Amino acid sequence: HDAVIRSTLLSFRGYECRGENGKFFIAFHHPFDAFRWCLVVQTILLRVPWEDKLLQQPQACNMTAGHRVTFKGLRVTMGIVSGEATFMKPCQRTGRAEYFGQVLNLSARVAGLAHGGQTLCDKNTWKKAAEVGFPHEHSRYIGLYSLRGVMDPVGLVQVSDASLNMRSFASVKGAQKVIDPTDKFRLSIKDLETERIDRP
């Protein structure tokens, strides 16, 4: 798991800010890079030669849909957000850049809502990736949620692609869904183009 994460970062312009006990905080140049990396890693993890002892565990066993393997081995939760950090300083222990600010809290909250094998992001970050070509066909908007320590409700998107679209997940865990009739967000390139025209 750790080896897969670290060996793939450079190809997607990723930088490991922190990695400990199987949890990573990673910075990317653009949300598009982060989306592509997350989905590649989720796919690679299906092909890792996991030990039989691990595969016998309910949280790591093989699952299929039709003839396709949907889960196998460790199921990693991932959360993607974007924004400006308040400040950065080198970690005294590792020397790596450490970032601080509200965006860090949001990233932790979004990642914490995901189930194993699921990748979530906030809708504003999804827009940034979609506007530069990230395909929308297999992603799904799952609604507004109230997150601890975050002032406004956050629209969450489940990010996926053709290789992972057979995965299914239970409802978001640990957050209260917010019902807002004015929330008309859709995962549609047409809607994004309309929004750009209407934007002042």
Predicted regions and their residues:
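Hydrophobic alpha-helical membrane-association signature
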Residues: 1, 37, 41, 102-106
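Conserved long alpha-helical elements within nucleotide-processing catalytic cores of c-di-GMP signaling
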Residues: 1-3, 18
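Catalytic core of nucleotidyl cyclases, primarily class III adenylyl/guanylyl cyclases
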Residues: 8-36, 44-102, 120, 126, ...
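Short, conserved phosphate/pyrophosphate- and ester-handling motifs at nucleotide-, phospho-/glycolipid
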Residues: 34, 110, 149
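A short, structural micro-pattern
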Residues: 72-74, 104, 113, 150-153
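Intrinsically disordered, glycine/charged-rich C-terminal tails and inter-domain linkers
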Residues: 86, 116-200
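Catalytic/regulatory signature loops of cyclic-dinucleotide turnover enzymes
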Residues: 103-123
